[in-house]
Amino acid sequence: MQGDFDRAVELYQGSIALHPTAEAHTFLGWTYNMQGKVPEAIAECNRAIEIDPDFGNPYNDIGAYLIELERYDEAIPWLEQAIAAKRYDPRHFPYFNLGRVYLAKDLLNRARELFRKSLDIEPRYTLARQALENLRRMVN
């Protein structure tokens, strides 16, 4: 599996050398994250934002990476920027990730609202549905 990620890094770097796009930097960031290289992943997302500040994915991804590092307060503005981004289709992701932040901060009502909002946008999003069910079990 590691070889696949190493090869993906090479291919994304080659693509970026020929034609740097926000998407390619974001995908390279995902690959770095899968390798456990979170600082490199965040750096690639920042490069993506420099190229296209309207592209929402890298904002959400930085927020998600910060959540994994348990840097919850730092994640919030990144996720809010993802929600506000002009060019971002899977808007349910930042709402779900904000819900994760507020759940970790023990702000359960706010977390519930955000998980519901994620499901309003994408009713088939299993992770948000599971998070909402887990939250209901915690409260009851």
Where are these regions (language model features)?
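Structural marker of alpha-solenoid helical repeat scaffolds
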Residues: 17-18, 51, 85-87, 121
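Structural signature of tandem alpha-helical TPR/SEL1-like repeats
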Residues: 2-11, 35-47, 69-84, 105-117, ...
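TPR alpha-solenoid repeat register
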Residues: 24-25, 58, 92-94, 128
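Alpha-helical segment of the N-proximal tetratricopeptide repeat
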Residues: 1-23, 27-30, 34
